[in-house]
């Protein structure tokens, strides 16, 4: 008997995201009674994102082609739901960061450190979510991306592809060969463009406030 509703399958099959999200939520609920909501949210996100990235890092070093195919198969359902929810969380965090910086009359070292950590973690979180999705899509239908030198790319290869896209809003030496993958790359490029613009704006605000 399956006790898990079908609507939750796409989350249950992503234990690392569940673990990090649960810790972040509990931490936020604990902090919000003593700290401003924006500050509590930023601290909770930073810790949750750091945990998620560590867990994904461990997965990346241990995964092989067979395990990547298996993960792609069990996580194929509702991929857009998970991706869009993740992007929404990152967007809310950036809004909370702007609110916190705007409310702070003086940009102390602690405020600057919090802003820097949040920007870095949010950027890495988004890039990692896209990297995971590229890997899943590739191993559900191999050949959608062509990596020079290998027919069986690992998570590091997909992370490289996603990080370059996040930084430059364009592909590197990897060829995109399917319409499905082009849609995902297009979304990633658009998200990266606006994310990078916002990061520049926040950075200018922090530097100006610190002077």
Describe each model-derived feature in a short phrase.
Residues 100-146, 150:
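Membrane-proximal helix-loop-helix units in multi-pass membrane proteins
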Residues 10-33:
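The first (N-terminal) embedded transmembrane alpha-helix
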Residues 68-86:
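Juxtamembrane helix-capping/reentrant segments at transmembrane boundaries
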Residues 37-54:
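Loop-to-helix transition at the N-terminal end of transmembrane alpha-helices
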Residues 52-65, 128-139:
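Membrane-water interface of transmembrane alpha-helices
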Residues 137-138, 143-178:
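Membrane-proximal soluble regions of multi-pass membrane proteins
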Residues 90-111, 165-182:
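Alpha-helical transmembrane segments and their membrane-interface junctions
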Residues 157-164, 176-211:
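Pore domain of cation channels
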């Amino acid at each position: 008997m399956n006790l898990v509703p079908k609507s939750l399958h796409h989350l249950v099959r992503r234990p690392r995201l569940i673990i990090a999200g649960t810790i972040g939520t509990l931490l936020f609920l604990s902090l919000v009674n003593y700290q401003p909501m924006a500050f509590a949210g930023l601290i909770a996100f930073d810790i949750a994102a750091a945990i998620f990235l560590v867990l994904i890092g461990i997965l990346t070093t241990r995964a092989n082609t067979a395990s990547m195919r298996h993960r792609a198969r069990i996580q194929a359902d509702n991929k857009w739901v998970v991706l869009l929810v993740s992007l929404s969380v990152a967007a809310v965090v950036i809004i909370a960061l702007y609110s916190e910086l705007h409310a702070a009359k003086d940009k102390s070292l602690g405020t600057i450190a919090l802003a820097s950590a949040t920007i870095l973690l949010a950027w890495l979180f988004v890039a990692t979510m896209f990297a995971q999705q590229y890997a899943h899509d590739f191993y559900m239908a191999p050949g959608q991306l062509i990596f020079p030198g290998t027919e069986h790319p690992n998570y590091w290869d997909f992370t490289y592809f996603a990080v370059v896209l996040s930084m430059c809003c364009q592909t590197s030496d990897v060829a995109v060969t399917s319409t499905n993958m082009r849609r995902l790359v297009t979304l990633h490029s658009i998200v990266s463009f606006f994310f990078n613009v916002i990061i520049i704006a926040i950075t200018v605000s922090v530097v100006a406030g610190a002077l």
